[in-house]
From Swiss-Prot:
It comes from Chromobacterium violaceum (strain ATCC 12472 / DSM 30191 / JCM 1249 / CCUG 213 / NBRC 12614 / NCIMB 9131 / NCTC 9757 / MK). One of its GO terms (biological process) is protein quality control for misfolded or incompletely synthesized proteins. GO terms for cellular component: cytoplasm; endopeptidase Clp complex. Belongs to the peptidase S14 family. Cleaves peptides in various proteins in a process that requires ATP hydrolysis. Has a chymotrypsin-like activity. Plays a major role in the degradation of misfolded proteins. The keyword Transmembrane helix does not apply. The gene is clpP. InterPro entries: ClpP, ClpP/crotonase-like_dom_sf, ClpP/TepA, ClpP_His_AS, ClpP_Ser_AS. Gene3D superfamilies: 2-enoyl-CoA Hydratase, Chain A, domain 1. This is ATP-dependent Clp protease proteolytic subunit.
Length: 210
């Protein structure tokens, strides 16, 4: 049976068996890592994946509101509304949320990476980050012209808001962010650090406390 804590669409998930005085207990690997306050966002940002991340963060806050949550991101991005539910939860809960890019953090994934607690935003050395303007999904968009205009105006407002927040978290000027997100803008881990998307590039666990 698939665990509710398990990232979606990953196929076979390893199990971990722990021994205790009460016998053996088996966990899927993601549930076991959740005990260490590690939350994964793997794959596209969807309503389903966002709901799992939000639920895990709220659970970890209830377990210990004063201990950091470690949020690992390997995502090409996805839904803005789903991503913003994660973003608002990160700000709402009491624990600091340390973010770590493993593989890639693109689009909404990059936004969530930058939104971690300042001083606690990391990327592994061969990961990559990509920022761009919001996308309108659904090439077959149809409907009344007036409704399409309404959606277009809303997307312009969303773009402005996302640029403001990215400027806030990166420390870049709004004008710089507006220019840099006009097209896909890829960064290496070190370039992401220089831009202000993260605070440190990690090559080993020792680098976290160095």
């Amino acid at each position: 049976m698939k665990s509710m804590m398990e990232p979606q669409g990953l196929g076979l998930v390893p199990m971990v068996v722990e021994q205790s005085g009460r016998g053996e207990r088996a966990y899927d690997i993601y549930s076991r890592l959740l005990k260490e306050r590690i939350v994964f966002l793997v794959g596209p940002v969807t309503d389903e994946s966002a709901n799992l991340v939000v639920a895990q963060m709220l659970f970890l806050e209830s377990e210990n509101p004063d201990k950091d949550i470690h949020f690992y991101i390997n995502s090409p991005g996805g839904s803005i509304t789903a991503g913003m539910s994660i973003y608002d939860t990160m700000n709402f809960i009491k624990p600091d949320v340390s973010t770590l890019c493993i593989g890639q953090a693109a689009s909404m994934g990059a936004f969530l990476l930058a939104a971690g607690t300042h001083g606690k935003r990391f990327a592994l050395e061969n990961s990559r980050v990509m920022i761009h303007q919001p996308l309108l999904y659904g090439g077959g968009l149809s409907g009344q012209v007036t409704d399409i205009e309404i959606h277009a105006r809303e997307l312009v407002k969303v773009k402005a808001k996302m640029n403001e927040l990215l400027a806030k978290h990166s420390g870049q000027t709004l004008e710089r962010v507006q220019s840099d997100t006009e097209r896909d803008n890829f960064m290496s881990a070190e370039e992401a650090r220089a831009y202000g998307m993260i605070d440190k590039v990690l090559s080993s666990r020792r680098d976290v406390t160095a």
